Amino acid sequence: VAPTGSVETEKAGPSYKPKEYYKVTEAILRLLLLASLVVAVVVMVTSKETELISVKLDPFPPFMLPLTAKFTQSPAFIYFVAGLSVAGLYTIISTLASFYNLLIKPGFCPALVSHFIILDVVMLGIVGTATGAAGGVAYIGLKGNSHVGWTKVCNKYGKLCTHLGASLAVSFFAFIVLLLLIILSIHSLSKKIPK
C-alpha cells in the first residue's frame, strides 16, 4: 500500500536555472573564442618560408636566389595579427569577468551584459575587418591578378599559403563564435525586459 500524501522525486543530475545555462554557455563560448584567436595568431606568426626563386636580369642568364616570405611583409597580415591580438586581450578580460559572474558573484547583471554586447560588437568588427583584409591579400597570393600584373605566389610558397589559409579559417570560426556570443547576450538581456 502506497502512502498517501506528497512524494518527492529526486532529479538526476544538478538542476540549473535558465540564467545559469546562459552563464555556462557564455563562459564556454568565451573560452572557445580565446582558443581560436590564439591559434589563428600563432599560425599566422609562424608562417614563414624560404624558397629558391629563379631571377632573370637582362642580359645575364637566370640564376637562383633564396627569397623568404613571411607575414610581416604584408600590412594586411600585420593588421590581422594586431586586430586578433586586441580581440584576444579583450577576450581574456571578458572570460575572467564571465567566470567571476558565474562562480563568485552569482546573479544576473544587466550592466555587465550590456557592456559585453557593446564591446563584443566592436571586437566583431575588428575580427571581421582583419579577416577580410588578410583574406583579400591571401586570395591574390593564391590566384594572382593578371589585369594588374600581380603573379600568384602560392605555387612557389605552398607551406606559407597553407599557414595563411588555416589561420584565416580559424579566424572565421572565431568570428562565428563572437557572433553567437552577441546573439546569446542580446537574447538573455531581452528576457529581462518587462512585457
UniProtKB/Swiss-Prot annotation:
InterPro entries: CASP/CASPL, CASP_dom, CASPL. Its main location: membrane. The chain crosses the membrane at residues 27-47, 76-96, 121-143, 164-184. Residues 1-26, 97-120, 185-195 are cytoplasmic. One of its GO terms (cellular component) is plasma membrane. It is a multi-pass membrane protein. It comes from the Eukaryota. Residues 48-75, 144-163 are extracellular. Keywords: Cell membrane, Membrane, Transmembrane, Transmembrane helix. Pfam families: CASP_dom. It is found in: Cell membrane. Homodimer and heterodimers. Belongs to the Casparian strip membrane proteins (CASP) family. NCBIfam families: A_tha_TIGR01569. This is CASP-like protein IN26. The lineage of its organism: Eukaryota, Viridiplantae, Streptophyta, Embryophyta, Tracheophyta.
